[in-house]
Regions:
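Accessory carbohydrate-recognition regions in carbohydrate-active enzymes
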Residues: 36-392, 396-440, 446-514, 521, ...
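N-terminal secretory signal peptides that target proteins for export/translocation
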Residues: 1-17
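Bacterial N-terminal signal peptides
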Residues: 20-31
């Protein structure tokens, strides 16, 4: 449910601010002693958050960064939605929060009862009866459980069956408990179907002995991407009494092998004598390498001493892993729903990228060859256009070991695939989305020390990407707009430009230019740090290329503001649509957004952006209009739903803040960057109301943990608004106390007495390790030392206080020489 708004507390007027600050200083002398994380912290996660509307999360079981997931399949392309009325099966591969069709659900398994044979309940003479849409089971939400590492649901068809799932990194387990005490219970293993709109191109299934089924399936995935193969193995805890396979021609009792082609039915059934036990446990594993990889993974994580691990043991191991991961961040304050929302966000931020190498270290690279990761983990599934904005930084902050291996993985992709990725899916590049997200992503990894020992290799790959384009025969698109960008300073807007995937940069020339400039500025800082002075200077200048697409004459008719980014054509002219009028609210030239929303994507050059908007006062007014600031301050609990963009795919004909998509995620902190941090606090508090303990409790697609990571940073009071800079902007925390174990032996401690997520509160002052801290930001070098941050909060906005002086604002690396914020 959504949190019930509470009446605003009456601001205290009995103690002056100095007295409150003195009290805070006294508190700083005592050590922070947050209670240890609860032993059942995994139960504070609600995996159903994001499973309704378009959050596109999955409710089933996964380990942190797991290779395998077990979750229900319904009628949606991402797997299952909370309001689906049937479960078609339990798939074994899912992405969390992605917004493209053709994804996941491979190896659809469902327990059923009834007769299988000629003329039976499952008539082997009719292949259509083995379609998982036809045999899908009804179910009930009553008693349904979605915890970190554990899922349970009651199937109400077939006499009633309890289905449970748990997962370790490379192996999973399902337990099916039938209500019937006699007759046969069957497990259908469907390899010819997966999630809705995810076509199986070819599949093979083999029944081995009386306990095993294994095989492979080839799918073409993610918005028309390249095909790839998933191998699987399932072992049961007791022998099946009968078996068979089905294919295009129907079912064959007793058959052990079936191979079918594109979109053809294919699978196997295994029959168990329920008089000998009502429960059947299946332990499964998958691999993207080969059949032996799936077997190796099952032996390594689903067995011990040659015997299958029991379901309960695997659940214990899975949830112990989650308990440790979740316990690295501890919060105090708020209510039960606040804690659930927070820890569910931590959970979702740690699902991806997914482990890509098998237990023996082997993985399938972007050259389709087999490689080995010795002593490190190779990862797969990188939604970089999304994750470079918040999730990458969250992992670097809390899991530096994972961040290091992610960096190593991206360099392996570059080495084996010939170029750096943008949206990597399994072992291929999809070329989904636009811009140059890999550059700020990797520069942040460098900034956070995750590329240590590989800085030179990373620089070479990033420089090649920034100054060139992949060859035509490469799957990678890279910066496809570079030919005009390097020559003229902007990406041409050309809807006819040939694409290597669904997206290509010139189709969205306006936003691509802004993304390139942001990336160049980030890379300039890396070049400077590595001693490449000439490249640093060139890239720094290119970091101001957002100005090349800023048209000072464009006027928004309704609000009266003048000057917006606008796409340009090959001849250098401003793009003008057929009707002769360009609107900054239109769809022309910007990817999943409008010029109104993209105008803020120049945070690397705040003085220049403010100058383009006619000064700080006008920039502030424009932000006020963008966020509906008057409405937010009047009704912070509800204004976001009334005033901002609501639909997750309502990209165009908009001028307000869109909390459902990535281009705007940093924009609340533009207020802070121009010296109005109290307004950042108001926007962030209003936006947090959109994250609730409910199936629709995330904003838009969660995008592999991106929205969840945004929420986490918003809740603890620091945010990385300028990629590549290492600057974390400070704002009002949601919780009174926070501790973050940073993976380097140090702990970040945050103290905000009186923090209340249902009230507008503003920062009156900050202390770092007991010393007054006037700047509105903290550098990564200081943050990684594990300081104690103390926030003094008040209900009154300090329009002349903390964070309002220009000297206390971070310097924009790519501001023009001599420019100042005015």
């Amino acid at each position: 449910m959504r949190p019930v708004p509470s009446a605003p507390a009456v601001p205290s007027t009995s103690r002056p601010l100095l007295a409150r600050l003195a009290c805070l200083l006294a508190l700083s002398a005592a050590p922070m002693l947050l209670q240890a994380a609860p032993t059942a912290l995994e139960r504070e996660v609600n995996t159903f958050i994001g499973s309704k509307d378009d959050g596109n999360t999955f409710p089933g079981a996964s380990a942190p960064f797991g290779l395998i997931q077990v979750s229900p399949i319904g009628s949606h392309y991402s797997g299952w939605r909370y309001d689906d009325d049937k479960i078609r099966g339990f798939g074994h591969s899912f992405i969390s929060g992605a917004g493209c069709w053709e994804q996941g659900g491979q190896v659809s398994v469902l327990p059923v009862t009834g007769s299988i044979g000629p003329g039976g309940d499952f008539d082997t003479g009719n292949a259509k009866q083995f379609d998982h849409k036809a045999y899908a089971s009804n179910y009930t939400h009553d008693g349904e459980i979605g915890q970190a590492g554990y899922y349970k649901v009651r199937l109400t068809s077939y006499g009633g069956i309890d289905a449970e799932a748990t997962a370790r990194t490379r192996a999973a387990a399902e337990r099916y408990t039938f209500s019937q005490r006699s007759g046969d219970g069957h497990v259908l293993v469907n390899v010819g179907q997966a999630n809705e709109r995810h076509s199986v191109i070819g599949s093979v299934v083999d029944v081995v002995g009386d306990r095993v089924v294994e095989g492979k399936l080839v799918t073409k995935s993610f918005c028309g991407g390249h095909q790839y193969t998933t191998w699987f193995r399932i072992e049961f805890d007791r022998p099946f009494k009968a078996h068979g396979t089905w294919g295009e021609g129907g079912g064959l009792p007793g058959a052990r092998h079936s191979m079918e082609g594109e979109q053809k039915p294919n699978g196997a059934w295994l029959s168990f004598d329920l008089a000998k036990g009502q429960s059947v446990t299946a332990v499964s594993a998958i691999s993207h390498v080969d059949a032996e990889g799936a077997r190796t993974n099952l032996r390594a994580e689903g067995m011990q001493g040659g015997a299958l691990l029991g379901f309960d043991r695997m659940r214990t191991l899975s949830q112990q892993s989650w308990r440790e991961q979740l316990g690295r961040v501890r919060v105090q304050g708020g209510n039960a729903d606040d804690r659930t929302v927070f820890y569910s966000a931590v959970y979702h931020a740690l699902l991806q990228p997914m482990t890509g190498n098998d237990a023996d270290g082997r993985y399938r690279g972007y050259d389709d060859g087999i490689h080995r990761a010795d002593g490190w983990t190779y990862y797969e599934y990188f939604s970089l256009w999304d994750t470079y904005r918040a999730q990458n930084q969250w992992l670097a902050l809390t899991r530096p070991d994972v961040a290091r291996d992610i960096g190593r993985t991206l360099l392996a992709i570059d080495e084996q695939g010939g170029w750096l990725p943008r949206w990597g899916y399994a072992n291929f590049e999809t070329n989904i989305m636009t811009g140059d997200p890999v550059t700020p992503f990797m520069v942040d990894l460098w900034r956070f020390g995750a590329l240590k020992g590989r800085e030179s290799q990373a620089w070479d790959a990033l420089r090649r990407n920034a100054f060139g384009t992949p060859p035509l025969n490469s799957r990678m698109a890279g910066r496809s707009g570079n030919p005009t960008y390097l020559d003229k300073g902007y990406v041409v807007y050309d809807r006819a430009f040939p694409s290597k995937g669904m997206d290509v940069d010139p189709h969205h020339g306006g936003s691509a230019t802004l993304e390139y400039a942001l990336a160049d500025c980030a890379l300039s800082q890396m070049a400077d740090g590595l001693g490449h002075a000439q490249d640093a200077a060139t890239l720094r200048e290119r970091g101001r290329n957002w100005r090349k697409v800023w048209d000072p004459q464009v006027r928004d008719a309704e609000t009266g503001f003048t000057g917006f980014p606008r796409p340009r054509t090959e001849d250098g002219q401003w793009y003008t649509p057929a009707d002769g009028h360009y609107s900054p609210r239109s769809h022309h030239g910007f990817h999943e957004g409008t010029a109104w929303q993209y105008q803020w994507l120049a945070q690397q050059d705040v003085p220049g952006l403010v100058e383009a908007m006619d000064g700080r006062e006008q920039a502030g007014r424009r932000l006020d209009a963008f966020f509906a600031m008057d409405a937010l301050q009047a009704d912070p609990l509800n204004a976001a739903r009334k005033e901002w963009v609501v639909g997750p795919y309502s990209y165009y004909n908009q001028f307000r803040y869109n909390p459902n998509n990535e281009p705007d995620l940093h924009s609340p902190w533009l207020y802070t960057l121009i010296g109005q941090p109290w307004k950042t606090a108001a926007v962030v508090r209003a936006a947090q109301q959109l994250f609730t303990n409910a199936p629709n409790g995330v904003t838009g697609n969660d995008d592999l943990g991106t929205m969840s990571a945004w929420y986490l940073f918003s809740a603890i009071g620091v945010y990385p608004a300028v990629p590549g800079s290492g600057q974390f902007l400070l704002h009002t925390p949601r919780f009174s106390k926070v501790e973050v174990d940073m993976g380097n032996g140090r702990t970040l401690r945050i103290d905000a007495p009186g923090a209340d997520g249902r009230r507008l509160q503003y920062v009156q002052g900050v202390k770092v390790d007991g010393q007054a801290h006037a700047p509105v930001w903290l550098d990564w070098n200081r943050l990684q030392q594990g300081p104690r941050l103390q926030f003094a909060l008040d209900a009154k906005a300090p329009e002349q206080g903390w964070g309002t002086a220009v000297k206390d604002l971070p310097v924009s690396w790519c501001a023009a020489p001599g420019s100042q914020l005015r």
